[in-house]
Swiss-Prot record:
Pfam families: Guanylate_kin
Species of origin: Paraburkholderia xenovorans (strain LB400)
Catalysed transformations (reactions): GMP + ATP = GDP + ADP
Functional note: Essential for recycling GMP and indirectly, cGMP.
Name listed for the protein in its UniProt record: Guanylate kinase
EC category name: transferase
Residues covered by the Guanylate kinase-like domain: 20-198
Record-listed E.C. numbers: 2.7.4.8
Localization per record: Cytoplasm
Length: 225
């Protein structure tokens, strides 16, 4: 679906910077994105996970308000038309959307925010937040991706086939990401993810937004656009 409420911000990378950072983790189904994200969040209480709205039916053990805000197509479209979503997309026949107000409130308060998102959504977010960091998680091979999809036992064989067919076109968009992590060894992939978060927090724009008074006292000012 196309989000008609996307509002593009100025291209100055320092304009309107919030104290909090915005991370987007993108991956095809079965690449291990959610497992890596959960491990990252467990060891870093400064990151808030954005909970998306979706029209997808809940999977076993998924809770409304914890894993997703599960809603109807009618309610989703009303929210979309009202401009409530920072980004929205249709994936495998279901709609997903991210709350704009919640994201901005968290970042203004100094919290980092992480979005588990698809490549379409990442493109929409980057039009509005040019400092957003996209991290693409790749599997070590297509064979490994298929095996992981089968092992998790969440989808019927026809759904797995559809996800594998979609994975090729999805992974082609890894070229649009700032960083790529290949999830062959979980511990190594998690370490790389943690390093990318730490490096992002040390960027000039991020440090200036968090410590503006210190920078001004030291005579350090924002570069011109």
């Amino acid at each position: 679906m196309t989000d008609h409420h996307t509002r593009e911000t100025p291209r100055n990378p320092y304009a309107g910077a919030y104290p909090g950072n915005l991370f987007m983790v993108v991956a095809p189904s079965g690449a291990g994105k959610s497992t890596l994200v959960n491990a990252l969040l467990a060891g870093d209480d400064a990151i808030r996970l954005s909970i998306s709205y979706t029209t997808r039916p809940p999977r076993p053990k998924e809770l409304d308000g914890e894993h997703y805000h599960f809603t109807t197509v009618d309610d989703f479209m009303k929210r979309h038309d009202a401009g409530e979503f920072l980004e929205s997309a249709e994936v495998h026949g279901n709609y997903y959307g991210t709350s704009r107000v919640w994201i901005e409130d968290q970042m203004k308060s100094g919290h980092d925010v992480l979005l588990e998102i698809d490549w379409q959504g990442a493109q929409q977010v980057k039009k509005q937040f040019h400092n957003a960091v996209e991290i693409f998680i790749l599997p070590p091979s297509l064979e490994a991706l298929e095996e992981r999809l089968k092992k998790r036992g969440q989808d019927e064989p026809n759904v797995i086939t559809r996800r594998l067919l979609a994975a090729g076109s999805e992974m082609a968009h890894a070229a649009e990401a700032e960083y790529v992590v290949i999830n062959e060894n979980f511990d190594r992939a998690l370490s790389e993810l943690q390093c990318l978060v730490a490096a992002t927090r040390s960027r000039f724009a991020s440090q200036y937004a968090r410590h503006t008074q210190l920078f001004v006292q030291l005579g350090i000012h924002l570069p011109h656009a």
